[in-house]
């Protein structure tokens, strides 16, 4: 199973290697975004953390928004590639569930921290609002196709209408934004998306992904 989950090494996701200075900016930004969210982090703070100049930053990016979009778009493609690889391996439902949980855990520990999720939910910048809305819709379309493929392979019950599965996937994000759940999961906010995914894959049974 692990071989299927890791069927695409992470280093193969990038189209081209980045220069050392650009990679330093990316890593500094990811660290700052993860701990503080991206909304309040300035270009100056990123440059300071990366030990580089603003001139160097603007050599690679028009502004902070461009860097934000690069990091999130890249992570989106990584997830897409891993799931497409998974389907190509003729995975079982258990393997699909294990991969989804593994990808989600990695996303929550590498990029989608609680401050980042809060910034996405309350984004005020119009450019980033359009970007994240577009990403969300792409995610829905891909996951609809992903679960439809599993259904065609008879891993998901054939009687479930695709529209119901699609609506359930969309409701997962709606649940993430419920204030009462945010309060309930405040001690461990990253547990909420895990429990929601668990509910989607296994319902109310006690079964869990290994």
Predicted regions and their residues:
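Helix-turn-helix
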Residues: 24, 32-66, 70
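Generic hydrophobic, amphipathic alpha-helix propensity
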Residues: 20-32, 46, 71-75, 79, ...
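An amphipathic alpha-helix signature
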Residues: 98, 140, 144-148, 162-166, ...
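Amphipathic, non-transmembrane alpha-helical scaffold segments
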Residues: 68, 72, 76, 129-140, ...
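Hydrophobic alpha-helical connector segments
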Residues: 70, 84-110, 169
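Short secondary-structure transition hinges
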Residues: 105-142, 152
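Hydrophobic/aromatic-rich alpha-helical bundle segments in the mid-to-C-terminal region
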Residues: 119, 153-197, 208-210
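N-terminal intrinsically disordered/low-complexity leader segments
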Residues: 1-20, 208-210
